[in-house]
């Protein structure tokens, strides 16, 4: 395309010269003048041919170098792209490690502190303790095995807090029948398929959760008997509902249904305040 443009340029520049010569030679145009004009034209064509050949060869020599430059640019662009990809991967790995090692622990610690503060404000710090759930078959055996030891240790600790006389850990044989009489036996637990039955979960201060089924028509005093049987004396501890949080009013002549326990309920064992003694 460049060689054709050069040829056209030379032809356009030669046309005015030819027209000028023809005008000059028209009045006295002879054979000699025609020969000279023809020679000039051939000389001009020869010069044009030489210029075209030189220009064509020069352009052909430039093409390989331009192709080589393009290949070099492609290689450089490819290398730059690979470097950018590696840098992005390295930055992504750094960001993921920062999130895993720094941000997540900070967020978990912040959530834990907020949870502790929330439970401290609501008075439910027992939720922060690690408890375990007993199977139904193990509950009765757990009651029998731990009632005596829990009764002595927990009541002794509560007595120290409230400046009450500490119960003696050594019980004489003569006093043991009195203790058994003070902690009455619970009625037999009804089956799951029985009607008018509710399940009560007893959440202890040490985080332990015990469950038992009761008939709605039973006397509400059975809840206090159950609390004493698992080791929390009614003179030092009381029962309260979870939500809304209020003390459970257990009266001698009221049934479970009368005090509002008509569905499955969770009750908390709480230590009585000293002012209430």
Curated annotation (Swiss-Prot):
Record membrane topology: Multi-pass membrane protein
Write one Pfam family the protein is assigned to.
UBX
Q: InterPro entries from the xrefs?
A: Ubiquitin-like_domsf, UBX_dom, UBX_domain-protein, UBXN8
Q: Which residues form the UBX domain?
A: 193-269
Where does it reside?
Answer: Endoplasmic reticulum membrane
Q: In which tissues is it expressed?
A: Highly expressed in gonads. In testis, expressed in post-meiotic round spermatids, while in ovaries it is expressed in granulosa cells.
Q: May I ask which residue range the UniProt record assigns to the signal sequence?
A: none
The chain's Lumenal topological domains, given as residue ranges, are: 23-33
What's the stated role of this polypeptide? Answer: Involved in endoplasmic reticulum-associated degradation (ERAD) for misfolded lumenal proteins, possibly by tethering VCP to the endoplasmic reticulum membrane. May play a role in reproduction.
* Record note on quaternary structure: Interacts with SYVN1 and VCP.
Name of the featured protein: UBX domain-containing protein 8
């Amino acid at each position: 395309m460049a060689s054709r443009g050069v040829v056209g340029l030379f032809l356009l520049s030669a046309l005015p010269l030819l027209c000028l010569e023809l005008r000059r030679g028209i009045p006295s145009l002879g054979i000699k003048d025609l020969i000279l004009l023809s020679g000039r034209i051939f000389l001009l064509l020869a010069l044009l041919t030489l210029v075209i050949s030189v220009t064509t060869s020069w352009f052909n020599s430039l093409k390989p170098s331009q192709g080589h430059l393009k290949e070099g640019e492609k290689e450089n662009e490819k290398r730059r792209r690979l470097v950018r990809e590696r840098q992005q991967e390295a930055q992504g790995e750094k960001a993921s490690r920062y999130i895993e090692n720094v941000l997540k622990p900070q967020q978990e610690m912040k959530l834990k502190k907020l949870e502790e503060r929330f439970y401290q404000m609501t008075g439910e710090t027992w939720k922060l303790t690690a408890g375990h759930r007993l199977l139904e078959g193990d509950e009765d055996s757990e009651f029998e095995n731990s009632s005596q030891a829990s009764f002595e240790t927990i009541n002794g600790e509560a007595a120290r807090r409230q400046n009450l006389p500490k119960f003696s850990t050594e019980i004489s044989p003569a006093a043991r029948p009195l203790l058994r009489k003070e902690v009455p036996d619970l009625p037999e637990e009804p089956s799951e398929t029985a009607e008018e039955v509710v399940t009560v979960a007893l959440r202890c201060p040490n985080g332990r959760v015990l469950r038992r089924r009761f008939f709605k028509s039973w006397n509400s005093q059975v809840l206090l008997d159950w609390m004493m049987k698992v080791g929390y004396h009614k003179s030092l501890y009381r029962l309260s509902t979870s939500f809304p949080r209020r003390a459970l009013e257990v009266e001698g002549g009221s049934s479970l249904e009368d005090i509002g326990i008509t569905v499955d309920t969770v009750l908390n064992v709480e230590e009585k305040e000293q002012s209430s003694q």
